[in-house]
A protein has these predicted regions:
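Acidic/histidine-rich helix-loop elements
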Residues: 48-64, 129-140, 197-206
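Short glycine/serine/threonine/alanine-rich loop segments
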Residues: 11, 103-105, 157, 225, ...
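Divalent-metal coordination cores built from histidine and acidic residues
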Residues: 1-109, 114-122, 126, 144-187
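Acidic, glycine-enriched loop/beta-strand segments at the rims
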Residues: 237-240, 255-261, 271-306
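Divalent metal-coordination and catalytic microenvironments
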Residues: 10, 41, 78, 100, ...
């Protein structure tokens, strides 16, 4: 994990829904102790999957009798959340959610339904892989119908859109290549501008697909639902993926800069159960701040104007983080 990169983009906390549990512990403890530089980690272990796993190395749960061991590990390693994955059966997912909730751990999923009926707390990605072979959130043209909006809004499930990994990052790169004119890009990943080309003849269709997809988060917010920021890094570069995601949600989805900023700070903290500690500027809160030259409420691109970041009261300049 490149903690210095995240801090240079103003990221002071990370919610990581899947990963090696022991690596997560090492990162969380080393950063928490000050031995390693980086954002605080809200993490978990590998995604919990069915007997025919989607990715290698994840726990396989073929029946409810296998659930207690995985939940016990989650408790002992102090997971902040659990992610149920693509090939976990609906019945086993329901039992995982029930068991996780019994020890106070929230559960997220790739699917909206039946996860919402099973009591899941969140859903990842506007699309997302599924054992059903299709998304339960958007059509093949990336359109979402009102039943999707209603389920998200009424249930209170969080939605982490990650529209960048479905073409929005590339569209931002085409429409606004100045996003790469940044010393953080040239210092940390100078190759970031490569490979993100959309042929002119495909640009209108690509734009329409992204706009269809990006409209979902705005509609969820308008109907009282909960959007939290996420990127599915490292599919796109750390930090850069966040500011491009924020820009895409405003430019292509029509979200207000204020809603995007709140989804990145206070609402995200509340969704993790830490709204009383981080995510807002109030007396008694942990001192996490970013200092910008411009106002992101007027133009979301202003998040690029970061000059200083404060994490837990420690003030760091972007300039020193680059070296």
């Amino acid at each position: 994990m490149s903690g210095r990169v995240y801090l240079a983009y103003g990221v002071t906390s990370i919610r990581n829904p899947t990963g090696d549990p022991y690596e997560m512990m090492e990162l969380r403890e080393s950063i928490g102790s000050g031995r390693r530089m980086g954002p605080r980690i809200f993490g978990t272990g590998n995604s919990v999957d069915g007997s025919r796993i989607y990715y290698a190395g994840v726990p396989t749960l073929g029946s409810p009798t296998e659930i207690p061991l995985e939940i016990k590990r989650a408790e002992l390693l102090e997971y902040d959340l659990i992610k149920t994955y693509v090939r976990l059966s609906d019945g086993v997912q329901k039992e995982v959610i029930k068991s996780a909730h019994s020890i106070g751990i929230p559960v997220t999923s790739h699917e909206l339904y039946p996860a919402v009926a099973n009591g899941a707390d969140g859903v990842e990605h506007v699309r997302g892989t599924s054992r059903r072979g299709y998304s339960t959130k958007v059509s093949e043209l990336n359109r979402s119908y009102q039943d999707v909006i209603d389920l998200l809004a009424v249930s209170g499930m969080t939605l982490t859109p990650t529209i960048g990994i479905y073409g929005a990052y590339e569209l931002v790169a085409v429409d606004d290549p100045t996003i790469f004119d940044d010393p953080r890009v040239t210092s940390f990943f100078p190759e970031a501008a490569l490979g993100h080309y959309i042929p002119p003849e495909l640009l209108p269709a690509s734009r329409k697909l992204v706009e269809n997809m990006a409209s979902l988060p705005k509609r969820v917010v308008e109907n009282g639902g909960v959007i939290i920021m996420g990127t599915d890094t490292p599919i796109n570069p750390r930090g850069l993926s966040l500011i491009s995601e924020m820009q895409a949600l405003v430019d292509y989805g029509g979200m207000t800069p204020l809603d995007v900023m709140r989804a990145s700070t206070s609402i995200a903290a509340e969704a993790m159960g830490y709204g009383a500690e981080i995510g807002s500027v109030k007396e008694g809160m942990i001192a996490d701040l970013i200092l910008l030259d411009e106002n992101p409420l007027e133009d979301i691109r202003a998040v690029r104007s970061l000059r200083w970041v404060m994490k837990g009261g420690e003030l760091l300049s972007v300039k020193e983080l680059l070296h």
